[in-house]
């Protein structure tokens, strides 16, 4: 089965249909605004930084996986444990540090509009998730492509 290149979303503003190229999605987050929670989809595109949509990050992830696209990770924000979806293609570095007595994993991105995000999952756990979902991860042990 070939990968579908697009996903259908709905604008938070007026519920209109939005068709987005999956490979251009970098990060999906849940944010709070004056009206409550909203889902923001960030793009790796010079023409658009982000959109707010009605779908939850969980639903977007489920739709992406159902379309046979495995370049995405479902992680949890270190701030509020909210689900965040990350495109592995934009990850530059993953590191861990201690903040307020808690281990926090910071992921740095190769993206102009989003520098980094922090997650609950350890770097080791994220690496294992990437090995499972991505066949082109290079292992640190032998420096060969799996």
For the regions a protein language model found, what residue spans apply to each?
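Eukaryotic intrinsically disordered, low-complexity regulatory linkers and tails enriched in Ser/Thr/Pro
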Residues: 1-146
């Amino acid at each position: 089965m070939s990968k579908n290149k697009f996903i259908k979303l709905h604008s938070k503003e007026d519920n209109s249909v939005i068709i987005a190229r999956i490979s251009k999605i970098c990060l999906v987050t849940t944010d709070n605004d004056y009206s409550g929670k909203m889902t923001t989809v960030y793009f790796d595109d010079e023409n658009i930084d982000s959109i707010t949509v009605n779908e939850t990050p969980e639903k977007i992830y489920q739709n992406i996986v159902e379309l046979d696209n495995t370049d995405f990770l479902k992680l949890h924000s270190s701030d509020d444990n909210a689900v965040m979806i990350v495109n592995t293609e934009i990850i530059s570095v993953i590191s861990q540090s201690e903040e307020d007595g808690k281990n926090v994993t910071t992921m740095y991105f190769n993206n102009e509009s989003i520098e980094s995000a922090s997650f609950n999952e350890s770097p080791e756990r994220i690496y294992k998730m990437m090995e499972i979902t991505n066949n082109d991860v290079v292992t640190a042990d032998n420096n060969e492509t799996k």
